[in-house]
Regions:
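Alpha/beta-hydrolase-fold catalytic nucleophile elbow
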Residues: 30, 85-87, 110-111, 137, ...
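Alpha/beta-hydrolase fold nucleophile elbow
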Residues: 75-87, 107
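Serine-hydrolase catalytic machinery in alpha/beta-hydrolase-like enzymes
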Residues: 1-62, 66-76
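A conserved short beta-strand
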Residues: 103-115, 132-133
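The feature captures the conserved acid-bearing segment of alpha/beta-hydrolase catalytic domains
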Residues: 115-192, 197
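A conserved amphipathic alpha-helix that caps or lines the catalytic cleft of carbohydrate-
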Residues: 15-16, 97-98, 161
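Short glycine-enriched nucleophile-adjacent loop
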Residues: 91-101
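Active-site loop->helix "elbow" adjoining a glycine-rich segment at hydrolase catalytic centers
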Residues: 59, 87-91
Length: 209
């Protein structure tokens, strides 16, 4: 789970409140530059002057070659399912990762930055790399912005859900709408995504039996 600042504690509290009896390992990692390290490719600034440097591939390479193997060795979870969750640009990164590698069987993209330049083209031209459950969420007010770029997030997210529902590797897909704007209850929104993935995991396990 890629995080920013002090949101981990809030996320953990919300997760334990929603799933008090579940057994899971939550690992958070932080990057030096959010716009640089989570953007899948270069793009102009959506607001302000800070552009996106497109170093997401480097972050994913570190995650696959160092981060996940370290977690597997340290906590002996190599045989367990691995999920990736993120909020905002980190949510986009998590979703993009599912199109780029076959490690993650669950993705939670919460208030994802699907307004990112050319993401609409990318998602139409790619399919998931493995069987995967995908949770999407968005705040009801997020698309109601004067920023023309960010105002596309609603339609982009709806189209993303539609494409995933048509993807043969997508086992379960949902788009959940939350009250409020982009910065409302980020920890709780992430926790809801993990809870949904957990519920779908048990549904699939029971179905396979």
């Amino acid at each position: 789970y890629p995080h920013q600042g002090g949101e981990v504690e809030h996320f953990c509290e919300a997760l334990l409140e929603l799933m008090p009896e579940q057994n899971f390992l939550l690992v958070a990692f932080q990057v030096e530059d959010w716009n640089r390290d989570f953007s899948p490719w270069e793009a102009p600034a959506a607001f302000g002057t800070e552009a996106f440097d497109g170093q997401g591939a480097r972050t994913l390479k570190w995650l696959l070659e160092e981060g996940v193997p370290y977690i597997d060795r340290t906590y002996h979870v190599k045989e367990q399912e691995h999920w990736l969750a993120g909020y905002s640009l980190a949510g986009l990164f998590a979703l993009w990762s599912a199109y780029e590698c076959d490690i993650f069987s669950g993705i939670a993209c919460c208030s994802g930055s699907l307004w990112f330049k050319n993401w609409d083209i990318y998602m139409r031209e790619h399919t998931l790399k493995r069987k995967c459950s995908v949770y999407l969420s968005l705040g009801g007010k997020e698309e109601k912005t004067k920023n023309a770029v960010m105002a596309t997030v609603g339609d982009r997210t709806r189209e993303q859900e539609k494409l995933l529902l048509e993807d043969s590797f997508a086992e379960r897909v949902v788009l959940e709408w939350n009250p409020g704007g982009h910065f409302a209850d980020s920890g709780k929104r992430l926790a809801k995504g993990i809870k949904w993935l957990m519920e779908k995991r048990y549904e699939l396990k029971n179905y396979e039996k």
